[in-house]
């Protein structure tokens, strides 16, 4: 039996995005790491199906389940602002496989300076690509800005890790294991604002409820970027804080001392166990489509909105990025 799709809106959220649980379910769906292995052909099919559904011309015999699956693939692989296919490594669905490997090795190889520098560099290279891929595409980023952001974040991460390693030499071993997290958190506070500095300088695009562009707001940009920084730190925090405690205890066991070669793979696997939950939880902390009271915007932009809408538009909306 053919499904009636006349009233189906493919862009309507399946879960209430005003609630934390609804957002977590949404991101659990689109950050599914299995979508990383979907073929280019299937991704292109998903984009065609989504675009046809928006125009109301889906092929006969199409089922709702097919459209929902197409939307899942589309959201996982295509940028929400431009509709362009994102590079695989930069997608949020790659956070689990990519993040678990890097996190596991950062936590394992934290004792020697060359290893600390190398893995912090690898992590910041990965973060820079993720930040660029998931930026608000309405605010263009130059090659110079990307290079400066990458250099600054990498320098910050390495300097933090090296400095704290030196300061914690006489501290309990567990404290030294937490150094990678401190470096990651510090770098996130630098990398994301630097990568998106144009939004802080010129403002982020804000729209009305009907997706009509109103103007650009620096205050909205500051809020969106702050939320992204908090989300990224939250994503890595549980694994990078609790895993050192777990490994500190496990490594004292007799059988673990005999299989030191398995310590790194074990940390990678355990990092994955944390990230499989923390990626959607961290992404869902704040709505991706942010709502901001007009009264919080810059006075000049407030005047523009009041002149155009009167008091009928109490809020503006913008994509904060991921």
From Swiss-Prot:
Predominant localisation class: mitochondrion
One Gene Ontology CC term in the entry: mitochondrial inner membrane
UniProt keywords, alphabetically: Acetylation, Amino-acid transport, Membrane, Mitochondrion, Mitochondrion inner membrane, Mitochondrion outer membrane, Transmembrane, Transmembrane helix, Transport
Protein name: Sideroflexin-2
Mode of membrane association: Multi-pass membrane protein
Record-level Gene Ontology MF annotations: monoatomic ion transmembrane transporter activity; transmembrane transporter activity
TM ranges: 100-122, 142-164, 174-192, 228-250, 265-287
SS bonds (residue pairs): none
Function, as annotated: Mitochondrial amino-acid transporter that mediates transport of serine into mitochondria. Involved in mitochondrial iron homeostasis by regulating heme biosynthesis.
Family: Belongs to the sideroflexin family.
Catalytic activity: L-serine(in) = L-serine(out)
Tissues expressed in: Widely expressed, highest levels in kidney, liver, and pancreas.
PANTHER family assigned to the protein according to its UniProt record, in alphabetical order: SIDEROFLEXIN, SIDEROFLEXIN-2
Localization (cell): Mitochondrion inner membrane; Mitochondrion outer membrane
BP term (GO), one: mitochondrial transmembrane transport
Species whose genome carries this gene: Homo sapiens
Modification sites for N-acetylmethionine: 1
One Pfam family cited in the UniProt record for this chain: SFXNs
